[in-house]
Amino acid sequence: MRLRNKPWARDAIAQNPDLVIQQPATWKGNWHRCFGRQAPLYIEVGTGKGQFLTGMAKHHPEINFIGIERYESVLVTAMERAKEAELTNLKFLSEDVYDLLDFFADGEVSRLFINFTDPWPKKRHEKRRLTYKDFLAKYEIVLKEKGDIHFKTDNQGLFEYSLHSFSKYGMILHNVSLDLHNSDFEGNIKTEYEEKFAKKGMRIYRCEAQFRTNEESHNL
């Protein structure tokens, strides 16, 4: 994906510290205080321009949401969307998912979304895929017991790889869809990419993957 340079993005983000959290590590284990309330915490890695997470925050005011996006030129659009919607249950981090454990305590997150991530199709880039086992290990730490991942992609190869990765890690798969928009699944909120792909008639793949409890893993 080629990104347009927006030299003003960094300054715009810096002027909104209540929305794009600076030094997020200081809130590790205390995100409920950052939001000013106790509520389940859902995060999206690679939040892009924020259409999905803004929609989720509108539809689920009872949930606290955090979007993680490392590219400021993209994040600034998500920030403006959230500002316009006046959402108090949505915040962003201009950070890299590699550093996830620096920002969230063990078991602090209830759900994690991965939407239309870069498929990194070459074998030598496997470790960069956000469903690679090393990333799953990070997600497992920050997610609560029985926490889950909701995953969407247009890339069949990445979807098949991810199903295998989830299963090999010992996760439980739910609601696997090979054609989301022609399924009975309700409550789907589209990302920008998803809308674009859907207009072209492309299939959207979706699944939910849940980590096993220690007891469930022991009984395997």
Curated annotation (Swiss-Prot):
Active-site residues, Swiss-Prot/TrEMBL: D118
Entries under CDD domains matching the protein: AdoMet_MTases (cd02440)
Family: Belongs to the class I-like SAM-binding methyltransferase superfamily. TrmB family.
Catalytically driven reaction(s): guanosine(46) in tRNA + S-adenosyl-L-methionine = N(7)-methylguanosine(46) in tRNA + S-adenosyl-L-homocysteine
InterPro entries: SAM-dependent_MTases_sf, tRNA_(Gua-N-7)_MeTrfase_Trmb, tRNA_methyltr_TrmB_bact
EC number in record: 2.1.1.33
Gene: trmB
Species, as recorded: Halalkalibacterium halodurans (strain ATCC BAA-125 / DSM 18197 / FERM 7344 / JCM 9153 / C-125) (Bacillus halodurans)
Name by which UniProt lists this protein: tRNA (guanine-N(7)-)-methyltransferase
Pathway assigned to this chain's UniProt record: tRNA modification; N(7)-methylguanine-tRNA biosynthesis
